[in-house]
Curated annotation (Swiss-Prot):
The keyword Zinc applies. The modification 5-glutamyl N2-ornithine is found at E56. The gene is lysW. A zinc finger (TFIIB-type) spans 1-34. The modification 5-glutamyl glutamate is found at E56. GO terms for biological process: L-arginine biosynthetic process; lysine biosynthetic process via aminoadipic acid. Disulfide bonds: none annotated. This is Alpha-aminoadipate/glutamate carrier protein LysW.
Length: 56
């Protein structure tokens, strides 16, 4: 298990060691976060909110 910090509220989040980049986790503050790997280390960033595309 790896302890990471929420980029929104600074709270601690425990993520599995085998978490993959792109995996989504939700923090108790309500933020939807994406696991990213930079320089061999896991970190979190705010997940992009993709809306529905109706072809307009």
């Amino acid at each position: 298990m790896v302890n990471l910090k929420c980029p929104i509220c600074g709270g601690e989040i425990t993520v599995e060691d085998d978490a993959l980049p792109g995996e989504l986790v939700e923090h108790e503050c309500g933020a939807q976060l994406e696991v990213v790997k930079q320089n061999g280390k896991l970190s979190l960033r705010l997940a992009e909110q993709i809306g529905e595309d109706w072809g307009e």
